A protein has these predicted regions:
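GST-like domain detector, emphasizing the conserved glutathione-binding G-site
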Residues: 1-143
């Protein structure tokens, strides 16, 4: 392409090159599930689907802190999503998080159940739900 020819993006972008490398299977340039796989659901209201990555651990730490201060309803079941094996692209996980990224959580104490994904959004949701660890109003909330 020379400088005098303007770039015109295609109407539908398609990935034409296979990814390579060690971590190629944890990201994809397209959305949607690659396979059917139901997610397990335990006995507690909160179901966390994650892996022990920095973002995954953040949510687990907050849930444990909520339990430590005696917050009723903060009990949870944690389920391993092995991103190295592509678990995040299963239909059950994609139903919760269409971005196919960990962590993701489902709150079954609401009707219908609330799907929350991305670590920051989950942490804010939990702080608001349990009125703990974050100011709820005013400048303190922004700071």
């Amino acid at each position: 392409m020379n400088d005098s020819t303007p770039y015109v993006p295609p109407m539908v972008w398609q990935w034409e090159q296979e990814s390579e490398g060690r971590f190629a299977n944890i990201n994809r340039p397209v959305a949607g599930p690659t396979h059917d796989k139901e997610l397990p659901v335990g006995k507690h209201p909160l179901q966390l689907y994650s892996l022990a990555t920095p973002n995954g651990v953040k949510v687990t730490m907050l849930l444990e802190e909520l339990l430590a201060i005696g917050k009723e309803g903060a009990e949870y079941d944690a389920w391993l999503i092995n991103i190295g094996q592509g678990d995040q692209f299963g239909s059950g996980f994609v139903d919760i998080n269409p971005n196919s990224k960990i962590p993701a959580m489902v709150d079954h104490s609401t009707a219908p159940p609330t799907r929350v994904f991305e670590s920051g959004a989950i942490m804010l949701y939990l702080a608001e739900k349990f009125e703990a660890f974050a100011p709820m109003q005013g400048p303190e909330r922004a700071e």
